[in-house]
Amino acid sequence: MYFDEEQLLKYTIYAYRLSFFVGICSLFIAKSCLPEFLQYGKTYRPKENSKYSSILERIKKFTVPKAYFSHFYYLATFLSLVTLYFYPKFPIVWIIFGHSLRRLYETLYVLHYTSNSRMNWSHYLVGIWFYSVLLLILNISLYKNSIPNTLNMNAFIIFCIASWDQYKNHVILANLVKYSLPTGRLFRLVCCPHYLDEIIIYSTLLPYEQEFYLTLVWVITSLTISALETKNYYRHKFKDNHVAPYAIIPFII
């Protein structure tokens, strides 16, 4: 079967949208039935493997080092550089490149992952998928000339403020005594202000291309679930002593 260029782009966009639909549905299924898939870092609670464990159980509980987070940003930075080569005059490409490069720097030089800090293999694959499809839809939109080559100043200012705030919050987390309760800044009000920053950062992409609404929905859904996991962990460990009243969005969640 032969597809012309227009059909190929159309079906690629359909596949992009479908992947987010499947991904979001999978999040809720995992939350209800397979919580191990959503745990990482301090919220990851390993269970002893019996020698009689089934192969399926071993696959379900397989983990990788949390330091592999850097792979997400190596990938995003590389794909952004390739996109910059072809579309150097579009501000949104520089914005995504800058975000990827900053997160790579933080992962390598700010955040400190111990050898015991781990995440489920599914979390790792989802990260690779997310940054791949993010750059895929960016390139498709650029190719279709549906993205303006001008800078949205309001969105850019919000992006810069949220990026700076996220960096400062990551510094606080990096300087914590292992698995202690973070304090200061917005940590007094929400357990995961760095997740809130991430949501704000991705919301600033919408003025450039409405297709990014799916990436925003994904970020809101996945990080809200992670923030609720973190809040539950804090409540269990610190018995509600000075735990922030909200998980991610002040006065809402």
Swiss-Prot record:
It catalyses: a di-trans,poly-cis-dolichal + NADP(+) = a di-trans,poly-cis-polyprenal + NADPH + H(+). It comes from Saccharomyces cerevisiae (strain ATCC 204508 / S288c) (Baker's yeast). InterPro entries: 3-oxo-5_a-steroid_4-DH_C (IPR001104), Dfg10/SRD5A3 (IPR039698). It is an enzyme of class 1 (oxidoreductase). It is found in: Endoplasmic reticulum membrane. Its EC number is 1.3.1.94. Keywords: Endoplasmic reticulum, Membrane, NADP, Oxidoreductase, Transmembrane, Transmembrane helix. It is a multi-pass membrane protein. Its main location: endoplasmic reticulum. The chain crosses the membrane at residues 18-38, 78-98, 123-143, 200-220. One of its GO terms (cellular component) is endoplasmic reticulum. Plays a key role in early steps of protein N-linked glycosylation by being involved in the conversion of polyprenol into dolichol. Acts as a polyprenal reductase that mediates the reduction of polyprenal into dolichal in a NADP-dependent mechanism. Dolichols are required for the synthesis of dolichol-linked monosaccharides and the oligosaccharide precursor used for N-glycosylation. This is Polyprenal reductase. Disruption phenotype: Suppression of filamentatous growth, defects in cell polarity, and cellular elongation, due to defects in N-glycosylation. One of its GO terms (molecular function) is polyprenol reductase activity. Belongs to the steroid 5-alpha reductase family. Polyprenal reductase subfamily. Pathway: Protein modification; protein glycosylation. One of its GO terms (biological process) is pseudohyphal growth. PANTHER family: DFG10 PROTEIN, POLYPRENOL REDUCTASE.
